[in-house]
Amino acid sequence: MPRFAANLSMMYNEHAFLDRFAAAAADGFRAVEFLFPYEHAAAELRARLDANGLTQALFNAAPGDWAAGERGLAALPGREADFRGTIGRALEYAGVIGNDRIHVMAGLIPADADRARCRATYLENLAFAANAAAAQGVTVLIEPINTRDMPGYFLNRQDDGQAICKEVGAANLKVQFDCYHCQIVEGDVAMKLKRDIAGIGHIQIAGVPERHEPDVGELNYPYLFEVMDTLGYDGWIGCEYRPRAGTSAGLGWLKPYLGR
């Protein structure tokens, strides 16, 4: 049976961030995820989780200067020291909050960049991150992201993500499979899930093409949830979408899966 985590960076924007935990729990969610925890004390976030009976599925390591347009550091030559600092901080937060998944963003690469050098940097940084996280029982995730939403992002395809994980060779390095990004970049989502399930550490969903609720758009999510069940996926499914109107009003798709 699929288990869903509300993405508090995109959902429940009707509420102040710290109030989104209670709102998600009231709608039946038992887990949450979000992009970055670092504007709040880890202990405060843990208190919100505990007060509402929620599990933290994952969050991201800091991506560099998000406001300046940075979208990760892992594949950026010359930023290795900055990257390592983000891993240490993310693991400190995870140690308090209790999540066992951290997403590490690759970064934006100029069109004329030396991609081989960027890839070598990426592999080295991911090996460092996985080694540091292993001591804490944490899995590091990398996510192929579509270039329509994020032009220049280094990692775009599922097969490339899987190949990178295999090349690094760390048991706690896996792919964060976002059905939305996969559909936009390459399609054939069900077959990609079947092919790659052993290397998938987290799944996310959203309607395609506008990233609204999963019951809107071209993907048949009830079928994909059946595929995930058949494959034995028992992790959280992150709801990383932008509600068309009120978050709670758009949760009709979720109701059949609550209490099953």
Swiss-Prot record:
EC number, as in UniProt: 5.3.1.35
Catalytic activity of the protein: 2-dehydro-L-erythronate = 3-dehydro-L-erythronate; 2-dehydro-D-erythronate = 3-dehydro-D-erythronate
Positions of Mg(2+) binding: 143, 178, 204, 240
GO MF entry, a single one: metal ion binding
Keyword set, alphabetical order: Carbohydrate metabolism, Isomerase, Magnesium, Metal-binding
Gene knockout outcome: Deletion decreases growth with L-threonate or D-erythronate as carbon source. Deletion of both otnI and hyi abolishes growth with L-threonate or D-erythronate.
Enzyme active site: 143, 240
GO biological process annotation, one example: glyoxylate metabolic process
Family listed: Belongs to the hyi family. OtnI subfamily.
Function: Catalyzes the isomerization of 2-oxo-tetronate to 3-oxo-tetronate.
NCBIfam families named among the record's database cross-references: OxoTetrIsom (NF043033)
Protein name in the entry: 2-oxo-tetronate isomerase
Lineage of origin: Bacteria, Pseudomonadati, Pseudomonadota, Betaproteobacteria, Burkholderiales
